A protein has these predicted regions:
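Glycine-rich phosphate-binding loop of actin/hexokinase-like ATP-binding domains
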Residues: 1-51
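ATP-binding/phosphotransfer module of carbohydrate and carboxylate kinases, centering on a glycine-rich
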Residues: 32-166
Length: 166
């Protein structure tokens, strides 16, 4: 999810991945966009992490206001796509997911999806030769199918699974 923060989960074989701690996708470190006025981001823990560069508060700091009022072609969204695409690229080469689902308040701006998909492919530089990724990117990097109640369904399923395992 991309909203006031950035959260991510990894599901393998129907089970969420949990090792030393839960995946902290939001704190992966990224390269700054050359036109970013806040290249270190707003995270109090890490300079240049995904959450500090791409969550809602970072977008607001970048435009010094409420980004919800901006037009889709505002340059801030190319910067946003640059950071989200780095996350996608990192996940593709490390986790090799079958699908990347991007939800949350920031991702309600549907114009971001084409920008993120295009930038992800550019960043991969032809390294990953997958038909699913190269020719069906619209079905690979997607919004949640159950939006706006996807979070509720996820919580329900986690609770149900916990009860079954108790």
């Amino acid at each position: 999810t991309v909203g006031t923060g950035i959260g991510g989960g990894v599901v393998v074989g129907g089970h969420t991945v949990h090792g030393l701690l839960h995946p902290e996708v939001g704190h992966m470190l990224l390269r700054p966009h050359p036109d970013d006025p806040i290249p270190h981001g707003v995270c109090p823990y890490h300079d240049g992490c995904l959450e500090g560069l791409a969550a809602g508060p970072a977008i607001g700091a970048r435009v010094q206001g409420d980004a919800r009022e901006l037009p889709d072609d505002h340059p801030v969204f190319k910067i946003e796509a640059h950071y989200l695409a780095q996350m996608c690229q990192n996940l593709i080469v490390t986790v090799s997911p079958e699908k990347i689902i991007l939800g949350g308040g920031v991702m309600q701006r549907e114009g971001l999806f084409p920008l993120v998909r295009q930038e992800t492919l550019r960043l991969l530089g032809g390294y990953v030769q997958s038909d699913r990724l190269l020719n069906h990117t619209d079905d690979y990097i997607v919004p949640p199918a159950l939006y706006p109640v996807s979070g509720l369904w996820g919580a329900y399923l986690l609770g149900k699974k916990a009860l079954e395992n108790a």
